[in-house]
């Protein structure tokens, strides 16, 4: 570079930088010129002036605006067409369009705007790269690591097969082609493409499921567990390769152990300490946010120097951050909006700028001859993807996952995502891929991310989002198993009723109880939804928690019972009414509960003459939970203290009313669990419908004495006389009503199945008068204000899915 060259000084004066004639040297003034002198610069000084977009700041603003425009164009287009495409494919499509317009004429205005080759730092690309690593960090923050500890053997088998078998198949294909002819691709390119198509990134899978809003379902947890296994296998393979590299192997192995120890014994305890220092309902202090971000940057730089693909450093720190409020939610609320709205679109779009569309159009002509670079790349991608899909679906179906879910699971694990796009950019930087390899691989990512969500939307049944692959009900619970329940509280009036209800179980060392209490608080206005675990967060000294009465009541209950026999966890969920059932169902799914207990929405005065409260929002919530819960559900109609009879020295009297059907069997199983309390007297009223000429024995619900006896038996003795069974033959609903009224004052609690007696003579004529569908015909009769006594009622529905 000649410092005495007039053009060199002219460029430095006007442009702020200069490039040598041979393009090997670049010089820039400091401080850097980032702002334009205005639109008139190029007009007044045509020979030396710059267009405003050639300055760094206007150029960055122009790129951000253009990327946002194209992203939103495709986003709105897909939404208007009811096509469930996530954000990332829309971002990628935006840059493909820009790329096509730019390369139609080499050196065109668009090309100089978006892809300038002036040697200056690429600010937009740098911002996009930061958005990518920040996305990984926030994705790690949003993931509940506790879910990974619950990985089932079948998830491990699926995860192992979905990685190893496709990888081996691709490797065999490469060796076969090499044996029979010359490869157009290098072995390294083959290996990277095969690896990329074989793995299923945990973060990518989680992102897809989150976009489709099924990440918290039982299906979503299963798929994420499978993806976590594939990541673990990849980590073991990479670590094993590093350890076998002679002298560097041992130091790297020691570093891996130190990193794991640092995360487990330092970072994780510090995160928990931050949570405990934050009073419930309060925001996390800024200094703690800065501390977490500084730690993430430190681990990122550490990973950059010792390992490959340093983005994992941010992701691991994200995983080490407890999900949910207060810390995880604070990080997401603070950074996600700007990152997803501004920085990440730059990555999703500009990462596609290396596409060589013109080469691809020429190479397509060779596909019909089954030769050439594009043919080899496309064929290996298709073959490995098909093998992966088939192996995953067959393995899932073999371990008793429903056929439809097995297909969807294979689709999700075969999907390509932002992770694969980032990894492609990484290996291009390492010169392991050229533009041709990147073009084929990146377009395969785009096609996969466009088609997979559409196929999943077509195959997956969203109404089963909270369905479970395991039995979660009272009937299948083993005699000595711990009973896991979730009791819900809306109003202060419900505290006493739910405490009384939990006391019914009388937990012992042989009959343990895990009680999860969820206090549902309705949000008004624009408040932010929160979810608080009172085991993790404590109220600040001098303040009062909105759930203080709930906490005090249940902790007092725990002190009066055997501590080893009962465990109580209390949560508060503050959300909009229309979303309350989602928090409830997700918590039930996460805690693996067998029974959810909901309070009835209506309450009466002591003499039952007036309605004290009638909450329609609560009634709608109960309906939604009954339809979508992953376990059995009970609706508790509380009308008097359950232990009132004991105050007078008598036993607590329970009557289970059964006709037939699975809900009645669930009611019997619940009654059998209560029978372990020696202060409880149990009676079973078996209503037997008389068959009409139009009915057959197979068309009505049926339950004989042997079935009842089988459910009510205990491990202690085959014959147990601590319960009695009364059988009544019924012709119609009016006769059923008379029988129920005749025993109204004999019992303190009635237990009935929600579907008990449906479509039989027992409820004939009653269904037309049923006021509350959620209680069923028999439950509605007992809970009505016309019923003579104030006995409480529990209506049970067995697990639906």
Curated annotation (Swiss-Prot):
Record keywords: Antiport, Ion transport, Membrane, Potassium, Potassium transport, Transmembrane, Transmembrane helix, Transport
Subcellular location: Membrane
Gene3D superfamilies assigned to the protein according to its UniProt record, in alphabetical order: 1.20.1530.20
InterPro entries for this protein: Cation/H_exchanger_TM, CPA2_transporter, Na+/solute_symporter_sf
GO biological process, one term: potassium ion transport
Its job: May operate as a cation/H(+) antiporter.
Gene: CHX7
Sections of the chain in a coiled coil: none
Cited Pfam families: CHX17_2nd, CHX17_C, Na_H_Exchanger
S-S bridge residues: none
GO MF: antiporter activity
Chain ranges passing through the membrane: 58-78, 83-103, 128-148, 154-174, 192-212, 223-243, 254-274, 287-307, 312-332, 340-360, 377-397, 407-427, 438-458
Membrane topology summary: Multi-pass membrane protein
Tissue: Expressed in pollen.
Highest taxon of the lineage: Eukaryota
Protein name: Cation/H(+) antiporter 7
PANTHER family: CATION/H + ANTIPORTER (PTHR32468), CATION_H(+) ANTIPORTER 6A-RELATED (PTHR32468:SF73)
Family: Belongs to the monovalent cation:proton antiporter 2 (CPA2) transporter (TC 2.A.37) family. CHX (TC 2.A.37.4) subfamily.
Record's GO cellular component terms: membrane
